[in-house]
Curated annotation (Swiss-Prot):
This is Small ribosomal subunit protein uS11. The gene is rpsK. InterPro entries: Ribosomal_uS11 (IPR001971), Ribosomal_uS11_bac-type (IPR019981), Ribosomal_uS11_CS (IPR018102), Ribosomal_uS11_sf (IPR036967). GO terms for biological process: translation. Located on the platform of the 30S subunit, it bridges several disparate RNA helices of the 16S rRNA. Forms part of the Shine-Dalgarno cleft in the 70S ribosome. Keywords: Ribonucleoprotein, Ribosomal protein, RNA-binding, rRNA-binding. The keyword rRNA-binding applies. GO terms for molecular function: rRNA binding; structural constituent of ribosome. Belongs to the universal ribosomal protein uS11 family. Part of the 30S ribosomal subunit. Interacts with proteins S7 and S18. Binds to IF-3.
């Protein structure tokens, strides 16, 4: 083994894509909110989640946490030249509307809002009811 040799790792530079129109996928569950912004082909430009921003426990499921996640994701996507988005919302969480409003407030033009929550045609048995 050669003494004094250091293995260098080079980090690949992020490609700066130039995308005008994209899609925002908002997944809002009872526990967390995740906002992913993609180009038209579905390749991820940016994403953020309430838990990733430092919200923990029951604070992750608040509308404010979803708003912050959408804002962070939108700012990162606008660096790629994004101007308008289609919004696809999935899940029953409380951060749905707050995330959409935050995307509009960040300066993105929302061209479509669609609910893509999967609804079973009587598939799997749901979890038992909570008794509090």
């Amino acid at each position: 083994m050669a003494a004094g040799r250091v293995k260098r790792t080079t980090r690949r530079k992020k490609e700066r894509k130039n995308v005008e129109h994209g899609c925002a996928h908002i997944r809002s569950t009872f526990n967390n909110s995740i906002v992913t912004i993609t180009d038209a082909a579905g390749n991820t430009l940016s994403w953020a989640s309430a838990g990733g921003l430092g919200f923990r426990g029951s604070r992750k499921s608040t509308p404010f946490a979803a708003q912050m996640a959408a804002e962070t994701s939108a700012k990162a996507a606008m660096e790629h030249g994004l101007k308008s988005i289609e919004v696809y919302v999935k899940g029953p969480g409380s951060g749905r509307e707050a995330a959409i409003r935050s995307l509009q407030a960040a300066g993105l033009e929302v061209t479509l809002i669609k609910d893509v929550t999967p609804i079973p045609h009587n598939g799997c048995r749901p979890p038992k009811r909570r008794r509090v």
